[in-house]
Amino acid sequence: MSSSSLRVLAIGNNPNILFYTSRFQLAKNIDLYHVNDSKSCQFEIETEYYGKDRFELENHFTSIEHLTEALSSKSSEAVFDIIIMSAPSLQELSSLASKLTSIIDSNTKIFLESSGFIQLEPFVKLSMESPHVNVFSILTDLDIRQIGPNHFKHFPSTAKENTIYLGESKSSTEKYSSGVITLLTTFEKLFAKLFSNIKINLCNFSSIEFLSQQWKLAISRICFDPLLIMFEQENPSDLDQQIIAKPLISGLVTEIITVAKTMGARLNSSHDNENSLLSLWKNSYHSTNKPPALVYHFIHQTTPLNIDILLLQTILLADDFGIKTPYLEFLYSVLSQFERLNSGKSKWFIRSDEKTQILQSLQKSQKNESALQTQITSLQGQISKLRQELLMQAKQHEMETNELKEKHQVALKAQAQAQAQAQSQAQTSIEALTPTEATNQSDTNEYKATGTPNLRDIEDMALYSVNYGDSPVRSPPPVVSSQPQMNSPLSSHSQTFGENNGTNDKLLQERELQLRKKELELQERELEFQKRALQQQRFNNSNNSIPRKPSFPQLQQSANVRSNSRGMHGTNGAMSQPASAGNFVDPISSSIAAYDPQQPPSLPLQQPQQSVQVQPFHSHSIKPTSRKNRNSNMPNIGNPSSINMSDFGRPPNNSSQTRLNSMPTHSIVNQNRLRSQQSKNKLNMPHATNPNNTFNQVPAPSLNNHVPTQRQFSSSTMIEVTNNNNKVNNSSSNPDISTNSVVHNAMQFTNTNNNTSSTVDINDPKNIAPPPTTSVSAPSTPTLSSSSQMANMASPSTDNGDNEEKNGGKKKRFGLFKKKNKSKK
């Protein structure tokens, strides 16, 4: 806008203010500002003359404070040329006038919206600090109402002139001053341009006529419109039917006419009596069938009622002239309370339309509830349907699960039957391959030179589910089964029944383990007796002294001997230490084993197939000879460290045998020495390759007879010694010995000390004495014998002396006595 533009400010919520604003915003040379409670700057108005107009105000503010703040931020002037204002109450009007001080000056022209109000100009001047400011009033008979938020409408009436009045209401003078007339003339031209088709009336530049026009517009609004609200009537023609309304109408009309005439207003005949006023008021709304603007705004609550300015200002004016107005005061009090009720501030009363709204809201909520209930019912039906489907699926799943379980059980039963059949076939094949021992063996063969008895009383127990490995010559054919082939029938039996047969298989496995333990103990005992017999024989061969009665101490077995004993079973591989006399205590047996020169010694270290219980063996009676040719039943120990496998073929000279007075069994290891891998089907002892092993040593080359000797210790152990190639070979002529039989073979030895090649057959009944009846007893604690200590302290020179005796062919003193003579010297 240029500096020549007219700055106009419109303030208030009165519908007439917006009507004026709608016309001013069309002018191009007017800088328009608007202030009201609406937060929106878009407005819409419908009039009979200008039609429907929708516009947006650029400079719209919600309060004077916001306006002054915005103006102060701009560099332009903050003073307005024209201000059109209204207020809902006298107090707010005074406050608004005081706030305008910063945006007005002496040239500012203020127009008060006074349609239906009386003489507000002096009240505004008193509130302003500038008493010389020109304050005018503007009023119109146009019925402009607010029908909605920021929406206004013109309600036409045939009884009205549709005129805008400009002027100043004063009761002291009749004519305006020349300056006021000039200003009013200028504004008349301005409004005439802006409000075309509407009359602009200056009331002949007379303040009395302008005051009279104010009263004409205000009498019906003061006397009749509030009574419609009080009696809850919308149609003006129904007010006179109320009996109580007639005295109120009479009293109010009388008081208003009195005050108007007292102030100098000139009322015509149509406005100076009660009947004419009431008739004119009814006719003004007869064609529209609409209530008056005050009643309309009260019902729709769209805009303030302005009760304070309408009634209280009249009461104050009457009081200024000393006129009593009890009806008017009563009406003001009642309408003030009704306005509080209408705004919802009452404690006891509410509007019926609020109840209607509540009922409508309740009905709407009920409809929503019914819709939601229907939806809930539908969802519940879906839920029940889904539950039924879920139950059907669960039943079907259960049936399928039961079918699968039955199929699985049938498969397990079939598998168990197949495994049991395979196991029975395997057991049958094993029993078919197991030879039985001849029952008609003579009693003389029950005790062999090896010291291993035939234990027939535990034969059945040993035959029950015991397997120590396949025979080195012949093995059973493989068993065809539906299950994967195992390494051995025993491991297949243990694994298959352990997985499928439950408690019965566990009991069977425990029984097998017990049998294995007992069998291993018997094997260890057998090997211990074999070692003792070997040591005794070697001791007798190395020492040709006078036989002496041995003291029978307990055999103290060391850890290395136990490991050698386990090596004989094939669990630990080859024997790691030589079986020398230094590893044992004093020999406890004086039995002499016969020899057979035709049977060479051999030692295939195989896994023993059957263990038997140790029993006393027969002693062989040989006639005593001279001291020189008599054989001692004591072991020939030239040097305890020189005891080796080369002395196994040396038989004693004395054929007489002495039985043990006591047989030590306390030192025999009874622990469970199970093999490290039970699933292996062969437990054969690998061939000993350790050069320190006693069984790998060959006999001394100084022996008179080089015929190899063979001694069978048990059905599964055979020692073969060759003098030519210094190694142990597996005999190719080994018999096919079953795992569950104990075979005793005759053992023959060649006499290496005598020149004669006579042999003694120990199987001859003439040379076998019956077994002694000596009771076997063992001391509670093992003790070391003197011969064991002597064997540990022997020097290597003994072996040298013995070798010299063999090489020279000259009979020399025994190494044992020679060592003692040297020590005496």
Curated annotation (Swiss-Prot):
GO terms for biological process: endocytosis. It holds the Pfam family ApbA_C. It is found in: Cytoplasm; Bud; Bud neck; Cytoplasm, Cell cortex. Residues 490-503, 553-566, 631-645, 652-664, 789-798 have a biased composition (Polar residues). Residues 472-503, 538-664, 750-825 are annotated as: Disordered. Gene3D superfamilies: N-(1-d-carboxylethyl)-l-norvaline Dehydrogenase, domain 2. Residues 809-825 have a biased composition (Basic residues). Keywords: Coiled coil, Cytoplasm, Phosphoprotein. The modification Phosphoserine is found at S471, S551, S662, S757. Residues 480-489, 604-616, 750-759, 774-788 have a biased composition (Low complexity). It comes from the Eukaryota. Its main location: cytoplasm. SUPFAM superfamilies: 6-phosphogluconate dehydrogenase C-terminal domain-like. The modification Phosphothreonine is found at T496, T739, T756. One of its GO terms (cellular component) is cytoplasm. InterPro entries: 6-PGluconate_DH-like_C_sf, 6PGD_dom2, KPA_reductase, KPR-Related. Residues 366-423 form a coiled coil. Belongs to the PAM1/SVL3 family. PANTHER family: PROBABLE 2-DEHYDROPANTOATE 2-REDUCTASE (PTHR21708), PROTEIN PAM1-RELATED (PTHR21708:SF25). May have a vacuolar function. Present with 2180 molecules/cell in log phase SD medium. This is Styryl dye vacuolar localization protein 3. It comes from Saccharomyces cerevisiae (strain ATCC 204508 / S288c) (Baker's yeast). The gene is SVL3.
